[in-house]
Amino acid sequence: MPITHEQPNGFHSKQLNGSGIAKAKAMPYPSDLLSHFVKQHLELESYKNGQEIEIDGYSLSISAVSAAARYNAPVILRDSSTIRDRLEKARSVIVEKIEGSKSVYGVSTGFGGSADTRTSNTLALGNALLQHQHSGVLPSTTNTLSVLPLLDPIASTSMPESWVRGAILIRINSLIRGHSGVRWELIAKMVELLQANITPLVPLRGSISASGDLSPLSYVAGTLMGNPSIRVFDGPAAFGARQIVSSVKALEEHNITPISLLAKEHLGILNGTAFSASVASLVLSDVTHLAMLAQVCTAMGTEVLLGERMNYAPFIHAVARPHPGQTEAARTIWDLLSGSKLAHGHEEEVTIDQDQGELRQDRYPLRTAPQFLGPQIEDILSALNTVTLECNSTTDNPLIDGETGDIHHGGNFQAMSVSNAMEKTRLSLHHIGKLLFAQCAELVHPDMNRGLPPSLAATDPSINYHGKGIDIGIAAYVSELGYLANPVSTHIQSAELHNQAVNSLALISARATINSLEVLSLLTSSYLYMLCQAYDLRALQADFRQGLAEIVQEELRAHFSAHIESLDESPLFDKVISSMYKELNHTTTMDAVPRMVKVAGASTSLLVDFFMANQTSDAMSVAALTALPKFRETVALRAAAKLVALREEYLLGARGPAPASAWLGRTRPIYEFIRVTLGIRMHGTENLGVFQQGLGVQDVTIGQNVSLIHEAIRDGKMRGVVVGLFA
């Protein structure tokens, strides 16, 4: 009977078969993205606040990888007799094979396609492995170049430090499982690198992720050994870029003694998927955020486009078509629209005459958002589980069973699982971007946005093209996302004497997904910026409509009191103001004064018909009709003045930094975070004054404001706000 054993931290269970060999089981993750996102955030925050990441080979989470890689969270090894015993048994197998002159791949044989060579000089063999893998291209100097480069010499040739730190952590977690035959001392030395914040300078390119990420990991091994030709990042980052120095110098500065690797340990470090898994983990840590933010943006888009909450009704999704991702997206958006005064809460039945000319339902980018986002959520969850399992696996060859003494020659370094996870993630990022692009394109289009001005211009559109640059920019972003969505794994080439005839290209795929992540972050930032502008415009519209109604009522009485005093004026007023509201929606491309002339003129036929039908004499009808031009003129002048005054109040801050807050429900914290915390104001101040003070004096550029949102997404500040929506 199998014996079930719970790990102390409760994350993971494993089974021991009759011979005591541990059988790995996947760490349980929530089945929905929202629960995972919240759990991931809370875990990351705990690590950022000082909780130690304890490495045991079985419970490493994506949040822990992100915390150690990006926030320098403390890392320790679980120092248990069980772990040490497992390591010692596997190491003893290697020692016994060497002492018995047994042929073991990578210990007494050559590597890959050269595995037909033999040697008893195991240490020289290990050095030969590192020597040929130290073949990556890196800048030879950090001095100023005589010619301006086309790309940054460091960034274009070497990996970011976070990728390398994550890879070291994941490799530690693989080695401590006791299947690679390395010593505890080696694993502890790798932890020392993380604790001292010594990060090897690793080439960006050169791995096909077949026999693992051989070349990148060779630079980690070289650092541990104190190879003077291997350079590292060292020193504090508080006063500028970190220094790039020799590994020997860095180890000496931190009182770390270089380690002399023993037989199989060179290969044990190199033969794994740690870099692929590291980049994939860091990608997915942020992908969950963007996937949740896409649902938040869709809720916000539904509000500003005066859309239907019923698009996301449980009957459509949970009852009629219960795909789990679709159901989750609909439920999330539905909940976010709770309390909104902009989104329509219930579809009321109307007659054919009542909604003549009106769009009967929202367009696809809103109405089918759950169906579009749902499959992406499912693929992202699948990728999360795959990469988490990869981080808690032994990716090496050969593998040592310390219990039986058997050595298994296999291919656990083949990272195709990571490749597939990244391919589907990258495609999902494109689809998310496509949806947000479609929503934003609808938002800035005056024929589609239900009465908002073109390009969301808050002032006269003849000299305000506010969102046009963003409209173009997001088209560039989504186009690049489409290009990046192409699979990488279809470009696999045979390598290394045709031994690695199939390989995964997992690291290349993960790198491409990092690029997609960045581009989608830019697109999402741009859309959020426009959504906040649209919120303010809706609030301004509501104030203006109220003011217009008061003006119309006053002017009806002022110009036609003698003709309507004996009649119920309510039906007339309702018809007149309704016609003007409708004309407002059709004249958004016009400047204030001519627009209000046209809006006031929308009442003409209604008033003519009313007075012709309700006057007792021709003289009274003529008198009423004679007053019409003055009524229209006065309404137009007062309405234009009211609109300009409201624009000034909103743009100059009289209504506060977040004037639309009262209209929002659960999306309000996002809007207020952007408006209040980040300090991004409603756009249009310079246009209001017709650029009298020039450009850049009264406000920063549009791009600078979008950049603030992008930085908040990138550094995690926005993540906390999004989590708070669901607390």
Swiss-Prot record:
Domain of life: Eukaryota
Recorded catalytic activity of this chain's protein: L-phenylalanine = (E)-cinnamate + NH4(+)
Application notes: The structure of strobilurin A was used for the development of the major class of beta-methoxyacrylate agricultural fungicides since its beta-methoxyacrylate toxophore targets the Qo site of complex III of the mitochondrial electron transport chain and prevents adenosine triphosphate synthesis. Compounds such as azoxystrobin (Syngenta) and Kresoxim methyl (BASF) are among the most widely used fungicides worldwide. This class of antifungals are used as effective treatments against a broad range of destructive fungal plant pathogens and make significant contributions to food security.
UniProt-annotated binding residues for (E)-cinnamate: 271, 361, 367, 397, 468, 496, 499
Keyword check for Cytoplasm: no
The protein's enzyme class: lyase
Family assignment from sequence similarity: Belongs to the PAL/histidase family.
Name of the protein this chain belongs to: Phenylalanine ammonia-lyase str11
